[in-house]
Amino acid sequence: MSRYRGPRLKKIRRLGALPGLTRKTPKSGSNLKKKFNSGKKEQYRIRLQEKQKLRFHYGLTERQLLRYVHIAGKAKRSTGQVLLQLLEMRLDNILFRLGMASTIPGARQLVNHRHILVNGRIVNIPSFRCKPRDIITTKDNQRSKGLVQNYIASSDPGKLPSHLTIDTLEYKGLVNKILDRKWVGLKINELLVVEYYSRQT
C-alpha cells in the first residue's frame, strides 16, 4: 500500500487530529463517528483505527509500518514504546518536532531535496534514524534557510519535546536523548497497534 496523498481533512474527520499530516483539526463533533458493533468486529475496528492513526500521522506506507513493528518486536522492552521511539526518531519527524516544517510531509520534502544536514553531512533519506547528540541543520545557503525560517519563527517553544533543542538563530537542532513516551506528539494507544499486527500473523 502506497503513502497516502489524498484529502487530509477526510482523514482527520475519521481518525481525529493528526498533527504530523496537517495543522487542521476536525470540527467539534464531526470527528470519530462511533459505530457500536458487538464483539470481535468492534474490537477489530478500534485496533484498525489506532493503526491507521499511526500510519497517517507519520506518513508511512503499510509495508514501512509493518517493518517498524517487526523491529520493535525484537527489542527486550515494550514493543509499543519501542515502536513509537523508532518513529519519533525518524529524521522527517525530528524536523517536524523541531518546528523546522509545519507537517511531516513538508519535512520529508526538505530532506528529499537535500536541504538538510545531519552532523555536517547531507542526508536525503526521510527515514534516517537520528540518535542522541546528532546535530540537525540546513545547508548554509539562503534558499535552504529561507525554507525553514518562517516555520521556526512561528513555532511555539513550549511545545518542543524535552529530547530536542533548537537554536532559532542558527537554524540548528540537537537531539539530546531518546524520546520519553509522554512527549509523543500524537494521542495514540500503541498497544492496540501491536495487537492489530499480532492478530494478522
From Swiss-Prot:
Which Pfam families does UniProt cross-reference here? Ribosomal_S4, S4
PROSITE patterns, per the entry: RIBOSOMAL_S4, S4
One record GO biological process: translation
Q: Where in the cell is it found?
A: Plastid, Chloroplast
Q: Which SUPFAM superfamilies match?
A: Alpha-L RNA-binding motif (SSF55174)
Task: Report keywords, A-Z.
Answer: Chloroplast, Plastid, Ribonucleoprotein, Ribosomal protein, RNA-binding, rRNA-binding
The S4 RNA-binding domain covers: 89-157
Keyword rRNA-binding recorded: yes
Q: Name one GO molecular function term.
A: structural constituent of ribosome
Q: Write out the GO cellular component annotations.
A: chloroplast; small ribosomal subunit
Report the principal subcellular site. Answer: plastid
Q: Key word Ribosomal protein present in the record?
A: yes
Gene3D superfamilies in UniProt: Ribosomal Protein S4 Delta 41, Chain A, domain 1, RNA-binding S4 domain
As for what it does, the entry says:
One of the primary rRNA binding proteins, it binds directly to 16S rRNA where it nucleates assembly of the body of the 30S subunit. With S5 and S12 plays an important role in translational accuracy.
Read off the NCBIfam families from this record: PRK05327.1, rpsD_bact
Q: How does it assemble?
A: Part of the 30S ribosomal subunit. Contacts protein S5. The interaction surface between S4 and S5 is involved in control of translational fidelity.
What's this protein's family per the entry?
A: Belongs to the universal ribosomal protein uS4 family.
Protein name stated in the entry: Small ribosomal subunit protein uS4c
Record gene name = rps4
